[in-house]
Amino acid sequence: MTDLERLQAWLETYPRAGELTSYQVDYTDQLPGCFGVFPAGMVEVERTENLLGQVTVQNQYNFALYVVFAKAPGDTEGAQINADWVMDFQQWVQEQSVLRKAPTFGNIDQHRERLRAENGALYDAELTGTAMYMVRLAATFWKHY
Protein backbone atom coordinates (compact mmCIF):
# COMPACT_ATOMS: atom_id res chain seq x y z
CA MET A 1 0.00 0.00 0.00
CA THR A 2 1.41 3.42 -0.92
CA ASP A 3 1.59 6.31 1.52
CA LEU A 4 -1.23 8.05 -0.36
CA GLU A 5 -3.41 4.93 -0.20
CA ARG A 6 -2.79 4.66 3.56
CA LEU A 7 -3.77 8.30 3.98
CA GLN A 8 -6.96 7.78 1.97
CA ALA A 9 -7.93 4.66 3.94
CA TRP A 10 -7.42 6.56 7.18
CA LEU A 11 -9.41 9.60 6.00
CA GLU A 12 -12.33 7.27 5.37
CA THR A 13 -12.38 6.41 9.10
CA TYR A 14 -13.32 9.98 10.03
CA PRO A 15 -16.70 9.65 11.78
CA ARG A 16 -18.29 12.26 9.48
CA ALA A 17 -16.74 10.86 6.30
CA GLY A 18 -20.19 9.49 5.42
CA GLU A 19 -21.23 13.05 4.58
CA LEU A 20 -18.82 12.88 1.64
CA THR A 21 -19.58 10.87 -1.47
CA SER A 22 -16.70 11.07 -3.92
CA TYR A 23 -12.93 10.88 -3.34
CA GLN A 24 -10.39 11.95 -5.94
CA VAL A 25 -6.67 12.72 -6.14
CA ASP A 26 -5.54 16.05 -7.63
CA TYR A 27 -9.13 16.92 -8.54
CA THR A 28 -12.56 17.37 -7.04
CA ASP A 29 -15.93 17.85 -8.68
CA GLN A 30 -17.82 21.02 -7.81
CA LEU A 31 -20.68 19.01 -6.33
CA PRO A 32 -21.63 18.88 -2.64
CA GLY A 33 -20.03 15.92 -0.90
CA CYS A 34 -17.04 15.64 -3.22
CA PHE A 35 -13.53 15.88 -1.86
CA GLY A 36 -10.03 15.56 -3.16
CA VAL A 37 -6.56 15.13 -1.76
CA PHE A 38 -3.89 17.14 -3.53
CA PRO A 39 -0.36 15.92 -2.67
CA ALA A 40 2.02 18.87 -2.44
CA GLY A 41 5.24 16.91 -2.18
CA MET A 42 7.74 16.09 0.50
CA VAL A 43 10.15 18.46 2.20
CA GLU A 44 13.41 17.31 3.76
CA VAL A 45 13.48 19.18 7.06
CA GLU A 46 16.74 17.90 8.51
CA ARG A 47 19.48 15.36 7.73
CA THR A 48 21.97 13.95 10.23
CA GLU A 49 24.77 11.43 9.79
CA ASN A 50 26.44 9.48 12.59
CA LEU A 51 30.08 8.34 12.80
CA LEU A 52 29.19 5.05 11.07
CA GLY A 53 27.78 6.91 8.07
CA GLN A 54 24.16 6.07 8.88
CA VAL A 55 21.81 8.84 7.85
CA THR A 56 18.55 9.89 9.52
CA VAL A 57 16.28 12.27 7.64
CA GLN A 58 13.32 14.19 9.03
CA ASN A 59 10.73 14.69 6.29
CA GLN A 60 7.36 16.35 5.94
CA TYR A 61 4.62 15.35 3.52
CA ASN A 62 2.23 18.14 2.57
CA PHE A 63 -1.30 17.68 1.27
CA ALA A 64 -4.30 19.90 0.65
CA LEU A 65 -7.75 18.46 1.29
CA TYR A 66 -10.51 20.19 -0.66
CA VAL A 67 -14.11 19.52 0.36
CA VAL A 68 -17.22 20.81 -1.44
CA PHE A 69 -20.42 21.52 0.51
CA ALA A 70 -23.76 23.10 -0.32
CA LYS A 71 -23.85 26.80 0.53
CA ALA A 72 -26.07 29.35 -1.14
CA PRO A 73 -24.87 32.96 -1.29
CA GLY A 74 -25.72 34.68 1.99
CA ASP A 75 -26.55 31.36 3.70
CA THR A 76 -25.15 31.97 7.16
CA GLU A 77 -26.62 28.77 8.60
CA GLY A 78 -25.05 26.64 5.86
CA ALA A 79 -21.74 28.42 6.33
CA GLN A 80 -21.84 27.63 10.06
CA ILE A 81 -22.54 23.93 9.40
CA ASN A 82 -19.68 23.74 6.91
CA ALA A 83 -17.24 25.57 9.19
CA ASP A 84 -18.19 23.23 12.05
CA TRP A 85 -17.36 20.23 9.81
CA VAL A 86 -13.95 21.68 8.94
CA MET A 87 -13.12 22.49 12.57
CA ASP A 88 -14.32 19.07 13.76
CA PHE A 89 -12.17 17.39 11.11
CA GLN A 90 -9.09 19.32 12.27
CA GLN A 91 -9.73 18.34 15.88
CA TRP A 92 -10.20 14.69 14.84
CA VAL A 93 -6.85 14.70 13.01
CA GLN A 94 -5.15 16.11 16.10
CA GLU A 95 -6.78 13.49 18.34
CA GLN A 96 -5.84 10.66 15.97
CA SER A 97 -2.24 11.87 15.86
CA VAL A 98 -1.98 12.22 19.65
CA LEU A 99 -3.48 8.75 20.18
CA ARG A 100 -1.15 7.32 17.48
CA LYS A 101 -4.06 6.20 15.32
CA ALA A 102 -3.03 8.31 12.33
CA PRO A 103 -1.03 6.67 9.53
CA THR A 104 2.75 6.64 9.86
CA PHE A 105 5.18 7.09 6.99
CA GLY A 106 8.68 6.68 8.43
CA ASN A 107 10.79 3.64 9.18
CA ILE A 108 12.07 4.79 12.61
CA ASP A 109 10.78 6.83 15.55
CA GLN A 110 7.17 6.31 14.54
CA HIS A 111 6.13 7.29 18.07
CA ARG A 112 7.39 10.81 17.24
CA GLU A 113 5.44 11.15 14.00
CA ARG A 114 2.85 13.87 13.85
CA LEU A 115 -0.01 14.49 11.45
CA ARG A 116 -1.53 17.97 11.51
CA ALA A 117 -4.61 19.50 9.90
CA GLU A 118 -4.15 23.25 9.68
CA ASN A 119 -5.59 26.43 8.26
CA GLY A 120 -9.04 25.08 7.39
CA ALA A 121 -10.89 27.83 5.53
CA LEU A 122 -13.39 28.69 2.85
CA TYR A 123 -11.46 28.52 -0.41
CA ASP A 124 -14.13 29.41 -2.98
CA ALA A 125 -17.89 29.95 -3.17
CA GLU A 126 -20.00 29.70 -6.30
CA LEU A 127 -23.24 31.50 -7.08
CA THR A 128 -24.61 28.07 -8.02
CA GLY A 129 -24.82 27.18 -4.31
CA THR A 130 -21.58 25.35 -3.54
CA ALA A 131 -18.58 26.23 -1.42
CA MET A 132 -15.14 24.65 -1.42
CA TYR A 133 -13.17 24.45 1.81
CA MET A 134 -9.47 23.67 2.06
CA VAL A 135 -7.53 22.08 4.93
CA ARG A 136 -3.76 21.72 4.85
CA LEU A 137 -2.46 18.34 6.05
CA ALA A 138 1.17 17.97 7.10
CA ALA A 139 2.85 14.73 8.21
CA THR A 140 6.25 14.83 9.92
CA PHE A 141 8.23 11.57 9.89
CA TRP A 142 11.75 10.12 10.02
CA LYS A 143 13.63 7.75 7.71
CA HIS A 144 16.85 5.93 8.50
CA TYR A 145 19.24 4.96 5.69
Protein language model features and the residues they cover:
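Charged, amphipathic alpha-helical segments and their flanking helix caps
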Residues: M1-Y27, V43-Y145
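Charged, often glycine-rich, active-site loop that binds/positions anionic groups
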Residues: P32-V43
